[in-house]
Amino acid sequence: MQPVKTKKKLSRADKKQIEAAIARANRTDKKGKSAQDSIPYERMWPDGICRISDSHYTKTIQFQDINYQLSQNEDKTAIFEGWCDFLNYFDSSIHFQLSFLNLAASEETFANSISIPPQRDAFDSIREEYTTMLQNQLARGNNGLIKTKYLTFGIDADSIKAAKPRLERIETDILNNFKRLGVAARTLDGKERLFQLHAVFHMDEQLPFQFEWDWLAPSGLSTKDFIAPSSFEFRTGKQFRMGKKYGAVSFLQILAPELNDRLLADFLDMESSLIVSMHIQSVDQVKAIKTVKRKITDLDRSKIEEQKKAVRAGYDMDIIPSDLATYGSEAKKLLQDLQSRNERMFLLTFLVLNTADNPRQLGNNIFQAGSIAQKYNCQLTRLDFQQEEGLMSCLPLGLNQIEIQRGLTTSSTAIFVPFTTQELFQNGKEALYYGINALSNNLIMVDRKLLKNPNGLILGTPGSGKSFSAKREIANCFLLTSDDVIICDPEAEYAPLVERLHGQVIKISPTSTNYINPMDLNLDYSDDESPLSLKSDFILSLCELIVGGKEGLQPVQKTIIDRCVRLVYNEYLNDPKPENMPILEDLYNLLREQEEKEAQYIATALEIYVTGSLNVFNHQSNVDIDNRIVCYDIKELGKQLKKIGMLVVQDQVWNRVTINRAAHKSTRYYIDEMHLLLKEEQTAAYTVEIWKRFRKWGGIPTGITQNVKDLLSSREVENIFENSDFVYMLNQAGGDRQILAKQLGISTHQLSYVTHSGEGEGLLFYGSTILPFVDHFPKNTELYRIM
């Protein structure tokens, strides 16, 4: 064990905490018994090993949820079989306990995660409105409960020295078993285990847990003094008091001939504070088989006795009590399972701890839990004069003081599948709101930057809420983060929101006086190539759109354009002043000066965009493209110019991303009607390039489209799907549903969430997590009106 380093000096705050702990530690009842005396462990070490008794040592692993209830049947079967294998890992020398803690959190716990702090600017009223919306959504769900799951395992050993290596070996095996199931898990250290015990003992008051290992030596206190409640009261046989909370522990009597995998999930869906504890002890296989064989022998003996009686009484010897026949066949089936079907025997103690603020509420909570048990032909029975032992057995310590055990095989034990539905509620500073989990009613708050690939897609039929979802994310991102936002808006939908956020709407049309120069060059334009090479590549794409036709540019034409591009930037590169930036006309004039007839052909094709009626892109830039939120409105560009407009916007985005990269700032780029970009080979290739390279540059692109078929008809587009770890899928048309199911591996059950779904309802793909969501944004808000 590593010795704990002690501080030389304690701060004044530390001393205050220790004095408070000493005051609590000195509280005793008339018999001189303190609350600490009831807590059944001897010592907790900083690495998380706990000595429960002279020779029993335990460790605790916290594990996360996976989507079991949402999975299709074959996936459910795979999870169930994986869980059976997991249980079979435990031999009779390892006692283990599954603990499910649903504890009420203080309002501040969640309020801090969802509030958007005011910044004393023109947007504080919107921030306040958004925070209120989140608080209302939070109140609707059961996010008032913090739900955690633990596996505590323990072994007998003569000393901590002997226990430690063995516990570490078992810990590694358990973590690997969880990994095989796709479940995230981690081992708790000593302070984290104490924190969890403190949370159970202090349900009545949201006291912060304050403890440091180096407080123990100077104070003479034990770890129990920092976690014990103000008092325990076990006076009545059927319930107890812990501080100001009332509680009662019941055990589950399993009477049903067949168990259902929803039983545990239904307990955990209750909206009151609750702890479910399952103590499981594997029975030695040889002993289990011997016991069953002995039972079969006893049953056979009873059967013979009954047959003798029948012969003596003169009736048919085949008529024996039906119970005997049933028990006999069941015992033989059990023996067969143990001998040839990879089943083991387990002894299970299933405890449920309900708590409440008063006895009446406690009665209601227990009645609700009892109703769930009855629904599955089981019975929840209150422990009689064993409430103290029951409470201590519900702590994630790995100690079972209740000797009420039910023998079950592996598959019967595994039916209590500890997985229900995944949650996506991240506490990070930049976690944004994406709706409510349709399965659990909990808020979905995630930060796309934490994904391996933050690129995203928003997909849905017209009217399903695509643009609204994008606008909601833009508003949330603007109010909460310092990211820049760029929008390519082919339908002129985003202006009200952008203007309210004091952004810049750049309206590009043949009649507009807003100009963007496609020849603008940023000297930081590329990371590993010269800025000019990448700019040349862009201008080649632009010329290909203008000149190319079906065959695209010929090699000679490409060479001429590349030569002219390098010449046209000479003056600017020698003296990089804004007025030296070339425009399209400079390139046109250079092409006219070239000798090759191909150069004249390209120049003639460019003429309409330079001196003709489509010369909107032949001007120096005159708009503020440095605003934090920029929207390129290209609705009125017309068919001829729209493709070019989209390509120019993409080039502007690259410029912005490279500037922001140097400033360590993220850039979010939203492309509405994205399928339009993918119809042309040049814009499609450029878009795929963005999806491949943006992440390295701190860019987060989001494509918004209704035409999944168009999206997938492009040869390049599969790269976009492969490089998008975030997909926000709203209602889908029949044909599109099948394409997406194949592309993203969606089950039939999951597809039901995007089949004839309402506005703002669908499926969220976040990395490997799939969740159904609902987002009904309040309509009586300023934000709703501008979105």
What is the meaning of each model-derived region?
Residues 1-421:
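Extended, folded cores of ATP/NTP-driven motor/assembly subunits in large transport
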Residues 66, 73-92, 99, 103, ...:
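P-loop NTPase motor domains
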Residues 458:
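Hydrophobic anchor at the beta1->P-loop junction of P-loop NTPases
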Residues 466:
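Conserved lysine of the Walker
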Residues 469:
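Hydrophobic positions on the alpha1 helix immediately C-terminal to the Walker A/P-loop
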Residues 476-486:
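Post-Walker A helix-loop "phosphate-sensing" segment adjacent to the P-loop in P-loop NTPases
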Residues 502-506, 716-729:
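A short helix-turn-beta junction within AAA+ P-loop NTPase domains corresponding to the substrate/partner-engaging
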Residues 744-787:
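Conserved P-loop NTPase
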